UniProtKB/Swiss-Prot annotation:
Homotetramer. It comes from the Archaea. It comes from Methanothrix thermoacetophila (strain DSM 6194 / JCM 14653 / NBRC 101360 / PT) (Methanosaeta thermophila). Its EC number is 6.3.4.2. The lineage of its organism: Archaea, Methanobacteriati, Methanobacteriota, Stenosarchaea group, Methanomicrobia. Belongs to the CTP synthase family. The gene is pyrG. This is CTP synthase. It is an enzyme of class 6 (ligase). CTP binds at S12, D147, I148, E149, K185, T186, K187, P188, T189, Q190, K221.
Length: 546
């Protein structure tokens, strides 16, 4: 087993995850089996209870693990499926060590950071890295070198370096800020590497984030002061799309240097990623789409395009590449649609998407958008909460069930959405939802069946509430169809006769991959293409820049 450890310096948010995923993709292109581990130094057990305002989306793995969004990038770039064990947190490590101490497994020893915490970190890394027949394991250490939270993990990496001598490679991601006169400053990188050395670690390669490509003199200066060959100073300049980053790093000589340093030889030359980017570059048409959510604006909100709805954005991109038309997303604050007529906001869009979410805030605005899509024949895709609200909207405005709602929001005369039976006695919030992969059976001849091309599917879930079985008959009697089911659980709803009205209780975006888009997202993009042609007679033309 060979390990590639990716650390970060200067500041957080430099793109360590994309750098690590890109390295993995490049090594996959050479024929190697690659896996990935994300270390998160926070004390939380997992990301399940973290606010999207602070942390971005919670990504769900096949086994129900609720993890950092970087693991979604690993799955998409490497086309693999990870487990909750691929996400190591301070909370998990300390919980395990404390449980062992309580069971008497340390035989009366004083339990300390070194060796007990660091040994547990290394045990987890070795155990996970050897599953699935992988040959190379990427390890991204979250946070920034120098953070107190990261110290035990960096010490574990130092120990691993000597225990796995010759089979471990350190990549340090730093920043070269640019002054107003265009000078690239190297001092932050120098100080970051100095701090890393004080912990007993020396980077084998430095990937320098910068606005424009690193100048030769900047590379030479970093190489001189940080004790790495100039070939190991890689320009990580800004790219307009994350899927170009592997090719950019390849052009910088990153793959060649890592393979030489780790005594690796090309086993094959895969071109599928190059072909993907070429297909993406060839797209000249676009469609317009409204994403109506609650994490799209406000002083607390991070950039929604990157964080809270990341997997949805990527799934739309995958579908767009396949369909030959790129969705242009407009981020609509659901609360705005509680004050403004939907017609004024939504009339020029080719499709409307309501994503997953929790809580009552913004729900009326979302349902106003759903009603507009249903009544005006605009393609609609609802995900998780977006399906529940579509059912509530239909119950109120088509079935005449006044006050129909979800028990999540309080008392209601018509609880068309209710708590799952197995959730009724649950009191602890963390890791207690219906999480991970579950199957569904699709009815032949339905839109769902046409989209998937099969009657049996598996998708990822993250929810506590479901359609109340007591209301299924009245809903279907009035024209709604539940075309996908798992026993008594309704997984997919559609409205026959509508150009495209599809909503699902699961999260199809989390199984979408570049070159293998999620079927519902691909169908949605195709429906938007048709809507654009009906509405204007043509699709938009992308504005190309030199």
């Amino acid at each position: 087993m060979r390990y590639i450890v990716v650390t970060g310096g200067v500041m957080s948010g430099l793109g360590k995850g994309i750098t690590a995923a890109s390295i993995g993709r490049l090594l996959m292109n050479k024929g190697y089996r690659v896996t990935a581990i994300k270390i998160d130094p926070y004390i939380n057990i997992d990301a399940g209870l973290m606010s999207p305002f602070q942390h971005g989306e919670v990504y769900v793995l096949k086994d129900g693990g609720e993890v950092d969004l970087d693991l979604g990038n690993y799955e998409r770039f490497l086309d693999i499926e990870l487990t909750r064990d691929h996400n190591i947190t301070t909370g998990k490590v300390y919980s395990t060590v404390i449980e062992k101490e309580r069971r008497g497994e340390y035989l009366g020893k004083t339990v300390q950071i070194i060796p007990h915490i660091t040994d547990e970190i290394k045990r987890r890394i070795r155990q996970v890295s050897r599953t699935g027949g992988s040959e190379i394991c990427l390890i991204e250490v979250g946070g920034t070198v120098g953070d107190i939270e990261s110290m035990p993990f960096l010490e574990a990496m130092r120990q691993l370096k000597y225990e796995e001598s010759g089979n471990i490679f350190f990549v340090h991601v730093t920043l070269a800020p640019m002054t107003s006169d265009g000078e690239q400053k190297t001092k932050p990188t120098q100080h970051s590497v100095k701090e890393m050395r004080e912990l007993g670690l020396q980077p084998d390669m430095i990937v320098v984030r910068c606005k424009k490509p690193l100048l030769p003199e900047t590379k030479a200066k970093i190489a001189h002061f940080c004790d790495v060959p100039i070939e190991a100073v890689i320009s990580g300049h800004d790219s307009d799309d994350i899927y170009r980053v592997p090719l950019q790093l390849e052009a910088e000589g990153l793959t060649k240097y890592i393979m030489k340093a780790m005594r690796l030889f090309p086993l094959e030359e895969r071109r599928d990623w190059y072909d993907l980017v070429q297909r993406m570059d060839s797209i000249r048409e676009k469609v317009s789409m409204a994403l109506v959510g609650k994490y799209t604006s406000g002083s607390q909100c991070t950039d929604p395009m990157k964080d809270a709805y990341l997997s949805i954005r990527e799934a739309l991109k995958h579908a767009g590449i396949e369909a030959g038309v790129m969705p242009e997303i407009s981020w609509i604050d659901a609360e705005d649609l509680e004050r403004i007529q939907p017609e004024k906001v939504l009339r020029d869009f080719d499709g409307i998407l309501v994503p997953g979410g929790f809580g009552a805030r913004g729900t009326e605005g979302k349902m106003n958008a759903i009603r507009y899509a249903r009544e005006k024949g605009i393609p609609y895709l609802g995900i998780c909460f977006g399906m529940q609200l579509a059912v509530i909207e239909f119950a109120r405005n088509v079935c005449g069930l006044e006050g129909a709602s979800s028990t999540e929001f309080g008392e209601t005369p018509h609880p068309v959405i209710a708590l799952l039976p197995e959730q009724e006695k649950v009191r602890q919030m963390g890791a207690t939802m219906r999480l991970g992969n579950y199957p569904a059976h699709l009815i032949e001849g339905t839109l769902a069946h046409r989209i998937y091309g099969t009657t049996e599917i598996v998708e990822r879930h993250r929810h506590r509430y479901e359609v109340n079985p007591a209301y299924i008959e009245v809903l279907e009697k009035n024209g709604l169809l539940f075309s996908g089911r798992n026993g008594d659980l309704m997984e997919i709803m559609e409205i026959p006769g509508h150009p495209f009205f599809f909503a699902c209780q699961f999260h199809p975006e989390m199984r979408s991959r570049p070159g293998r888009p999620s079927p519902p997202f691909l169908a949605f993009v195709e429906a938007m293409k048709a809507q654009r042609l009906r509405r204007t007679g043509s699709t938009y033309t992308l504005e190309l820049t030199a």
